[in-house]
């Protein structure tokens, strides 16, 4: 077994599988934080909550799990052609499935390297009034707690796609 920062090479798992902490929503109150297993000190409402997978009352490296492929396990392509009275339509498609990508930089951290804030951070970040948000609380790059640097499933997204590589209509 070989563990990198957020990937793992382990027998029986895909090569370079994602090996991450499991995000479990966000803390919504100081009371919830006081009754939870947290990472370090300084945890505030709106911060990412992590699952304690091994139930040892602490969040540590043993709470990471394999949670997706870095490399697609399925690659496919197909084409078709239809003809009618001298008119022909043909297309070629290509895609991949069962692959995950990890967002980083300004997508996962507002104000990254002096950049601005994406619209999603302004509209979809956690606030005391919006506990059902898609993103954690908005913070500056230097104001981010250490626990936000933990590589976790909050920023893991499905990267499967199907694209039309060629579309041709002829007469």
Protein language model features and the residues they cover:
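Outer-membrane beta-barrel pore domains and translocons
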Residues: 83, 94-96
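Extracytoplasmic gating/loop element in the C-terminal half of outer-membrane beta-barrel translocons
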Residues: 10-17, 30, 39-45, 96-171
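Core subunits and conserved enzymes of cellular information-processing
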Residues: 73-75, 81, 143-146
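Conserved small-residue
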Residues: 1-69, 130
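Glycine- and acidic
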Residues: 61-64, 73-75, 149-156
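Repeated loop/turn-to-beta-strand initiation elements of outer-membrane beta-barrel proteins
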Residues: 86-91
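Structural signature of outer-membrane beta-barrel channels/translocons
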Residues: 81-85, 170
């Amino acid at each position: 077994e070989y563990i990198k920062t957020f990937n793992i090479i382990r027998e029986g798992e895909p090569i370079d599988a994602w090996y991450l902490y499991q995000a479990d929503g966000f803390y919504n109150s100081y009371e919830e934080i006081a009754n939870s297993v947290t990472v370090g000190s300084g945890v505030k409402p709106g911060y990412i909550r992590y699952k304690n997978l091994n139930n040892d009352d602490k969040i540590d490296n043993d709470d990471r799990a394999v949670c997706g492929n870095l490399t697609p396990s399925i690659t496919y392509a197909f084409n078709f052609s239809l003809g009618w009275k001298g008119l022909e339509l043909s297309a070629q498609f290509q895609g991949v499935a069962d692959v995950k990508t990890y967002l980083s930089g300004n997508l996962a951290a507002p104000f990254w390297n002096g950049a601005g804030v994406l619209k999603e951070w302004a509209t979809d970040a956690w606030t005391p009034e919006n506990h059902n948000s898609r993103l954690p609380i908005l913070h500056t790059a230097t104001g981010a707690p250490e626990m936000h640097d933990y590589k976790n499933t909050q920023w893991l997204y499905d990267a499967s796609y199907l694209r039309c590589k060629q579309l041709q209509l002829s007469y």
